[in-house]
Structure formats: C-alpha cells, structure tokens
C-alpha cells in the first residue's frame, strides 16, 4: 500500500484505512470452523433431559465406589425407536484421602443392556495411590439404536456412526442436520459426566475442578472433541484413533492396501469414502474432525496408537503430528492392535496423569525422522532407556495384525550421556517398519514410555489412488 507523505494527512488516512480494512473483513467473513465448533459447544451446554441417581456405594479398602445411573440428554427423539434419552453408568472411585482438585475420567464403550462395573481394579488402586478421584463413563455411544424408518437392525458402534454420517451427507450437509453426527451426543455425555463428578465431589476436601480424560477408538475421537469444547480438560490421552487429518490419512490407507480394510467396512457400506474431497464431507469434518480445530489443543497430550492396528496405517502420525500444538507426547505400542495390550497402555496413562496433576516435570523429548535416521534428543540427567523396534513384511507395505502377527522385535540401544541419538532406520527385503522407544524413569514405580512415530522403508506405494464413484 502506498503511504501519503504529508504529515497533516497521515493520521486521518491511517484511521480511515483501518476502518475500511475492518469493514471489508466483516463483509467478506464466511462461516469458519470456529463457528462450527461453537455449534458443538452450544449443543453440549444444553442440559435438557440430564439427570442422575446414585444407585449403589461400594466400600473398598482406601476408597468408595459410587455407581451412578446418568441420563445425558435426548438424541433424535423423533427418529429413533424406543428410548431416545441416552443412559450411562458412571462409576466414580473416591479415595479416603484426596490431595488434588484434578481428576481422571475414562470414556468407555458398552451397551444399554450392560450393568457391570467398568472401572477396573487398577483404576481404583491408582485413585488411592494418586489421592485423586478416578471415574469411568460407559455406553459411549448409547447403543444399540433402532431408527423408525423401516429399520429392524440394532445399530452399534461404527455402523451407528456411519448411519448418521450417511444421513448428514445425503441430506446436503445442512447445519440443522449436524446432530446426525454422533460425536455431538457422545461429547455431550462426557461433559455431563464431568458435571456429575464435580457435584459428587463438591463436599469433599478437594472438590474436582479439572479433568484428564482418556478413551479408545471412537471414544478416543470423543476425547479430542471433549477437550475442544470444555475448558475443564487440562490433559488427555486419546487411544487408537490414528486418523486426524482424515482425508489424506485414508487416501494413504487405500494406496497401501489397494482396498479398504475390513475394519472400516461399516463406512464402506454407506459409501462414505466416496464423499471424501466433496464440499459435503468438508462440512462434516469442520464439525467433528479434531484436526480442523487443532489450535485448541494446547493442553498436554499423550497420544497412544498400535503398530498393528486393523483400522489405521502405522505411519498415520505423519499427517497430523507436526501440526498439533505442544505439549504433545506419542506412544506407538509395539505389537499393539486396535485393542492394544491390556494394562500396558493404562499404566502409561496413569504415569503421565500422576506427573501432570502434581506438576512433576514431563520429560523433554525431541525427535525427527530424516535422511534415513531417527534423530533424537533426550533431556540430560533424566534416567532413561532406549530401544529400537522393527518388523519386516517381505511381501507388501501392510503391517496389520493378520499380515504380520505380533512379531515386532526390540533391540536395546546403549544410553548416551549427551542425550543425543542418531539411529539408522532399518531396511530389509520388501518393507520394514521401525520406531524408537524411550522409557523414562525405568526403575521407578511409574515409568513413562514414549516413542517416535513409525517409519516405513522404503516409502513408496504399491497401489493407485482411490477413485470415487460420485460424479
């Protein structure tokens, strides 16, 4: 912009230019992702239909477990058969001695027919050890659900989610249809669970005021969306939802396998993949895709994935990791499929959680994969071990469990006083997958395991891109 040189005009010109600039910006303003996330925020704030009741109190040595039946709200009452008010079991472990206002909430699966306690004994033990309240909400999403329109099928999990996506996309991706996206009521249910935990703890010595949340698979996705809409979330551990930046991630998926994995069959059945790169699909993602509002995730994050996942390629991290804000920590579980390996990941979550709530330093770890090497820098003077994990598939670039089994192998790497490591990316016949694992405080009762992303060598495709059937 050319500036006027006459001093007498400069202030007037500056003010007038600023006014024009602001006016133009307002006129040109278009719906953006902040407006879409605001719709989700508004949705979860609605407490219509919300209520809860304490059903039982179970005494453990060192803690009480509250069993609560919670209704999180109505969903599609004019379109579903039977109960449209989502029902959940919320189990809350309250230790006899509480030393923090922070709390851990697990987001779990289940069905409306279940009534067992999902909060495992390890969680109760950790509540006592960390002197913090630990809870678990089940039946996320509420399921099964039948729909009125000639539906005789009990819909669960991905079939239920894909059904709603299909309705939204084929209906023109209108704003008023956003509730079809099941992440809306799933996120609302978790927010209501936090409300209940706060109310139950309000009479305790340290009432809960913030949460660390964790869930797996579609509950992992809901972990992200809950963190985006509720400021009470001060940390999170989403598990096995290795698909942020979903379009390039799934384009990658197809070029690796030449087909869609059976694990995503429900989405294939509704032709969801054909909608990728359409304006309708972009609209869908703007509502519920964490990558679309990634700037909101400034809280500490421990992202846990499996290396032999049935749903996601083991190097999917590269489509989102570098763009996610700090502080962020990654763990790929060697030989971990979509269900991971039992307590392996939970122990790591508790280690991370304990360090976070008591303001213990989280280890500094920098890593990159460049020029055929893992380049790693570990903070000095922190006890740690280093290992290189690898697996080979001589036939194809496919590391799903049914192709390679649980055959990742580990090689110990000697520790360096400098904390700096340069480790060659392994190669072999066909394709080789590898990662570097660093275990911090290995001799303590709460070690913390972190890894680099997975590297695949050679980095090339065997198949052509997916061709949508939509015209």
Put a short name on every predicted segment.
Residues 172-188, 192-217, 233:
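Gly/Ser-rich "nucleophile elbow"/oxyanion-hole loop immediately N-terminal to the catalytic nucleophile
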Residues 29-99:
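Catalytic-loop region of hydrolases
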Residues 117-135:
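Short amphipathic alpha-helix adjacent to the substrate-entry channel of hydrolases
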Residues 225-274, 331-334, 340-344:
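Hydrolase active-site cap/lid region
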Residues 89, 101-110:
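Short beta-strand element of the alpha/beta-hydrolase
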